[in-house]
Amino acid sequence: MQTYESDANIGNIKILAVDMDKTLLTDDRVLPQGLDERLDKLADAGIVFCPASGRPAPKLEEMFEGIKNRLAFCPDNGACVIYRGSYIYKSNIDVELYQQVLSRASKDPRAVPVLCCFDEFYVLARDHQYHDEISVYYNTINYVDSFEGIDFESNKISVFFPGYDAEPAFRETYSPEFSDKLYVTNAGREWIDFMNLGVDKGAGVAHLCEHLGIDIADAAAVGDTYNDIPMLERVGHSFIVDNAEEHMNAHAKWRIPSNNDGGVLTLIDAILAAR
């Protein structure tokens, strides 16, 4: 697979959408040193940097607190899009439909369901033991005895698998049962996410491009795993980190260094140098 240096039109990139976990973040789940000054340079050059993640908006904005109003965000796997502090797109799930998912996951001994309501999140009180793991991704967590009767505006249901068995659960249970009604995606060994059909990171990036009047051929995406495939296949410039799962080679054009080796920083430097 060719490296990023082979992208002859890298200087044409106007939007850079980047996955977070195992792509931008190191294995210790921290942002790479040297990112802040590069984000300033991208903004000054008129290039939109867009974290694209299964993480919700509050957590993403918290990670980029000092510069968030100069960025775009594609949280919740594209179920909403934010540009410079304002929502430009939301996709809410029908209450009856998300209750079906919550009911099924609540009966699964492997699963810890999370109802995502943009700024607040709901988890069963019985699952409070997993607070430390869940709070890595979700800020304001409300513990409830039951999901029954809840009808809040929601754009995503996430299911956490503390036994690291999300992949078989996705293949054997949740995708077969719900993929005709919702977009079901597997985000590594710990999480399965449910959004409306037609919602994914690729659609989120497309909404951002449309809002800004930018051709998606001039957008770039970087990822490492399954839920990054839609945006990698939709943009004009698709990159995977060197630590990406092997099957991802089929879904991107170019490779950059690993997350722990600052691959996204290397790509940003190359984009800026080519302008």
Language-model features: locations:
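Conserved acidic, metal-coordinating active-site core of Asp-based
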Residues: 104, 110-234, 243
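Short, hinge-like loop/turn segments at secondary-structure boundaries
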Residues: 67-70, 90-93, 130-134, 201-203, ...
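Short, structured coil segments at secondary-structure junctions
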Residues: 66-69, 77, 177-180, 234-235, ...
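Active-site glycine-centered loops adjacent to acidic/histidine catalytic or metal-binding residues
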Residues: 19, 53, 224
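N-terminal glycine-/serine-/threonine-rich phosphate-binding loop
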Residues: 5-45
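Hydrophobic packing residues within well-ordered alpha-helices of enzyme cores
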Residues: 60-64, 170, 174, 232, ...
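Active-site phosphate-binding/coordination module
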Residues: 28-130
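Mg2+-dependent phosphoryl-transfer enzymes with acidic/Ser/Thr/Gly-rich catalytic loops
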Residues: 6-15, 31-32, 193-275
